[in-house]
Amino acid sequence: MKVKEMTESYIVYRRSLGEKYITGAAMLRCFVRHVGGDTDAMEIGTEVCSAFLYGKDGKVTASWFLRYSALKWMFEWAVVRGYMEEIPLPEEKPRQLEHMTPYIYSKTELKKLFDAAMMYQKNRSKIPPECMQMILKVTYFLGLRIRETVSIRIDDLNLQEPHVIIRESKFNKTRIVPFNHQVREMLQGFAEWRASQHPGCSDEKALFLDRKGQPMCLDTVRGCFQRIREAAGISRNDGAYCQPRLHDLRHTFAVNRLTAWYREGKDVQKHISSLSTYLGHDKVSNTSVYLTMTDELLREASKRFKAYSNGEET
């Protein structure tokens, strides 16, 4: 059986179990492009799998383990059905990376990102800078996952009763995310700009479109973000294995929300469940991790204030 045919059959199988299976499917299709769709599944060897796992840079990243898991499950499925004779993955796995510490953007860095989104392109790109800037703003101001942001449709957006419907996101949940007057005005302005660029688009169309009127590709958006971050001069030097990410905008939103509640004197423990619902977490414990990060942030802010008061910092 050809690799492409086998992979598509496996994806159909996973989805028949009730899974959305989006990320895994995307990784497996990347593997198909890597080895060639017409390659016989029986001919796949350890060397070609290792090259895919390590990527062009030959480094171990978080993606290494995600790719490994996706391939392992598919290969096991294929061996049972006789499509492959063995699992051609390397026997030794690299040491598991430490849990990724989220990067919390400062207000200054957020402004730099939003500004850079309008100026990072050296040549005309298929993604309008206005679109890229709004993707970053919506992801941060609403605390969304980037996949949720790019999946928003026009008919998901309600500007009269300010909210957006996030449909069947992670954990197959649909939720309503409200927003304030300032965000409503921001989205109203963008909707008017979008209508001028793509007249006659149906309400079922994606909110964010490229110059050809096509929905945004997630990988393209992530690639653009890396260039925007570099143009903004934002990097981390704390030994982390990757630079600030798009997803860190969501982490920043959560930490800033909790920090604001602390400063307002609110009982944060009572509010954590509502934040968990807002973020679309399946368990409150997934949201509670931000409490530790917020405590550290407030302690650091307190240190800086004391140093400033004592004339140690200018």
Name every feature range the model reports, one short phrase each.
Residues 1-314:
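Conserved catalytic core of the tyrosine transesterase superfamily
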